[in-house]
Each structure stands twice: as C-alpha cells, then as structure tokens.
C-alpha cells in the first residue's frame, strides 16, 4: 500500500520496500523517521524546483544518508557520511543497480553535510542535501507550506526533544573517530 504524504509517495517498488525494511531494521526510530522526513522534504523541493530524477535513487540516498552513524555500518576511520555512502553502494550493487546510479547515490550521501556544493550537482545529490537541511536546520522552511510540513511530521513524528536527540545520535555515531570531523560541521558536535 502506497501512503501519500503531502502529495508525495515512496516509490512502489521492490527496491524501495527492501530499503525501507533494511533501514527500519538497522537504524533507530529517531533516524528512521528523520530519514523518512528527509525524503519527503527532498521530493517536495524537487517538485517545486521542477527537477527530474529517479525517485528510487532519491529514496535510497535519503534513507541511507545517516546509516554511517549506526554501529553496523560505522568504520573506525572514515567520516560517517562515507560509511553511509559505502553501505548504500554495497546494497545497490547487490541489487544489480548500474554503477552510474550507484555513484549518484554515493555522492549524494557523502556530500550531504557539505553545504553549497550539492546544489550544483545532479538533482538527487542536491535534493538529499535540501531534505537534510530542511529537517535538521530548517533551511528553506518558508518554501514549504504549513500543510506540507504538518503532513510530513504527522506521518514521521519528531521526538519531543528532536534537536537534543539528533545531536546525541550524531555524537554517539562519531565519538570513536574524532579525527573524521576535522573541517566539517560535526566537529562542533564533539566540542566540549
């Protein structure tokens, strides 16, 4: 059954169902709902901007973007963004997805915390970042209607203390490898 949230649906495909199942089984409820909101906000931004893209690739990029914060997919020495991108790459490769499409998703995830660059790249890369920036930072908040924002959050609720909870989740996912945060926004998460 396909659920419509603010006029956006998750792709009705075997690949999307497997992505949902894997993310639900691997990530916390907080990250699952955050990643889902990222997808809806990203797709709404794409619709508003008139961008053309493969919705399955966008869904994969959004749902895997924080996978590198999980114990299962966290390496000892790579940035969490790269760990998440590698997890998506391995998953998509196992499903026979083309290398070109894998590279798009990998790049979208690897750059999702690098402001200013993704907006100049492939629509999937730009939109994953746009969805993340809206859900975590509220960037472009006014570009979404009250109805859209409410529908997304109703379908995938925020915790009562989302800001503190997501920062704690970032901290827990990267504290064992502080050197990977040098020169990026996650350095602030580890700062005392």
What is each stretch, according to the model?
Residues 38, 79-94:
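An active-site-proximal "capping" alpha-helix that borders the catalytic cofactor pocket
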Residues 89, 93-108, 117-122:
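Internal catalytic or translocation cores that form aromatic/hydrophobic pockets or channels
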Residues 56-74, 84, 106-115:
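His-Asp-centered metal-binding catalytic motifs of divalent-metal-dependent phosphohydrolases/nucleases
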Residues 2-6, 26-32, 36-51, 97, ...:
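Divalent metal-dependent phosphate-bond-processing catalytic cores, especially two-metal-ion Mg2+/Mn2+ enzymes
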Residues 11, 33-35, 53-57:
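N-terminal glycine-rich anion-binding loops that anchor highly charged ligand groups
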Residues 2-20:
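Short alpha-helical hairpin
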